[in-house]
Amino acid sequence: MRKFYTLFSREVRGYFHSPIAYIVLIFFLIVSGIDFYFQVSFMNQRQVQYTIQEAFFNSVFFWFAFVLIFPLITMRLFAEEFKLGTIEPLTTVPVRDWQVVLAKFFGALVFYIILWIPTLLYFAIFLKVTNEPAAHSAGAYAGSYLMLLLLGMFYLSIGCLTSVLTRNQIIAAIISFCAITLLFFLGLVQFILLDVSSETRDLLGYFSAIEHMGTFSRGVIDTRPIVLYVSMTIVMLTLTHQAFQSRKWRL
């Protein structure tokens, strides 16, 4: 466990010594801040049936930033190590391959969680200024951030897999972006194709991140997306472990 913690600490520190991490952080805070401002402005002009918290987590700005951050967070995880040759010491010291994979994954997950902490201030400021809560209940907040965690775990695991397949960070980012975007738009097919059967629509809805976020942001916790994203994260990390072992033996 001590070896895992050492690797994990190394990964977390690596983010805060990397310029790209601060670029991602600044980009995300700017886009999320603009998103929150526009949602508040829109709701001041019109009567709506949803809360500012629901609007924030289901807007175009939100999904634009959300899809973009994962390739940027994960592109360096393995690709940079293979390119610089710093992966070789990890293959000779007495650490297990799964410890390396999980340390990189959880290091990325910690940075991802840190990105979302400032958004809690948005809702606190909204409550302070308007004297009204941004959500109907605490469950709505919990559901929103739980879905952020689940989606984040899944998309980060995809980024881990794409990063271990190449030594070029840009290629890793492009592959990750394409894979995540494809999965994202798969959930939109049910809204685009109007002539599909109800069974097909339900199946596509099962994979729709937008629908899942819409449900959880209302405080409705559905166990099916939880099972889906946790199981798919495990699958992606297992594939990453296998790919890492394969590349390690070719060094």
Language-model features: locations:
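Hydrophobic/aromatic residues in alpha-helical transmembrane segments
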Residues: F70-T74, Y122, S157-I158, L239-T240
